[in-house]
Amino acid sequence: MGKDTIANIITYIRNADINKKGMVQLPFTNITEKIVKILLREGFVENIRKHRENDKSFLVLTLRYRRNRKESYKSFLNLKRISTPGLRIYYNYKKIPRILGGMGIVILSTSRGIMTDREARLEKIGGEVLCYIW
């Protein structure tokens, strides 16, 4: 596991999605827990469970799939890392982008914690853009 935990979360979820795995096991950190709770609240993930093994904690996610006639199961989860450790990107609350006209979400790290773009606009605070999810 590298230094960029958010990129690792996105990579774990994207790889599980590509390989049609129903579950993803993520190393537990406070940032991971907050981002995963946002995914659950917004309906991108079905279930979260905390798992402990050999003095290490993990979060186990159950990914959400929809049924399609042509393919048996199709995911509708797309993630993109925006702000990286080498290039931080900050937005004022007025300039936070809308993903797919409001269908997707932007996860921000603000002075009041990690939140979605809608919550940040309501509280009128900006912050560092962590990732886009649609």
UniProtKB/Swiss-Prot annotation:
Pfam families associated with the record: Ribosomal_S8
Keywords assigned: Chloroplast, Plastid, Ribonucleoprotein, Ribosomal protein, RNA-binding, rRNA-binding
Domain of life of the organism encoding this protein: Eukaryota
Statement: the UniProt record of this protein carries the keyword rRNA-binding: yes
GO biological process, one term: translation
Entry GO CC: chloroplast; ribonucleoprotein complex; ribosome
InterPro entries: Ribosomal_uS8 (IPR000630), Ribosomal_uS8_CS (IPR047863), Ribosomal_uS8_sf (IPR035987)
Gene Ontology terms, MF aspect: rRNA binding; structural constituent of ribosome
Subunit structure: Part of the 30S ribosomal subunit.
Family of the protein in this entry: Belongs to the universal ribosomal protein uS8 family.
Biological role stated in the UniProt entry: One of the primary rRNA binding proteins, it binds directly to 16S rRNA central domain where it helps coordinate assembly of the platform of the 30S subunit.
Record-given protein name: Small ribosomal subunit protein uS8c
